[in-house]
Amino acid sequence: MGCCGCGGCGGCGGCGGGCGGGCGRCTTCRCYRVGCCSSCCPCCRGCCGGCCSTPVICCCRRTCSSCGYSCGKGCCQQKCCCQKQCCC
């Protein structure tokens, strides 16, 4: 199922705040599942599971080394969320 009518986004949670004309126009994003592409919603970069409930929290690629911040919860194995803090 795609995001905001975009069929190429894999399994993502959809848009919570409406869509302004395409995959990259979501105002808010629901939680992503593994396989969601970065063009679904502007909050995400790369693919990871359980990320992106708001545009402020960004999905980063695969390891905590790409975050550039230390983590409070046993970082890091396969997923990484980053902006001001990293949470695995």
From Swiss-Prot:
Signal peptide: none annotated. Keywords: Keratin, Repeat. The keyword Cytoplasm does not apply. One of its GO terms (cellular component) is intermediate filament. Residues 4-72 are annotated as: 10 X 2 AA repeats of CG. In the hair cortex, hair keratin intermediate filaments are embedded in an interfilamentous matrix, consisting of hair keratin-associated proteins (KRTAP), which are essential for the formation of a rigid and resistant hair shaft through their extensive disulfide bond cross-linking with abundant cysteine residues of hair keratins. The matrix proteins include the high-sulfur and high-glycine-tyrosine keratins. Human have a similar number of genes as other primates despite the relative hairlessness of humans. Belongs to the KRTAP type 28 family. This is Small cysteine and glycine repeat-containing protein 1. It comes from Homo sapiens. The lineage of its organism: Eukaryota, Metazoa, Chordata, Craniata, Vertebrata.
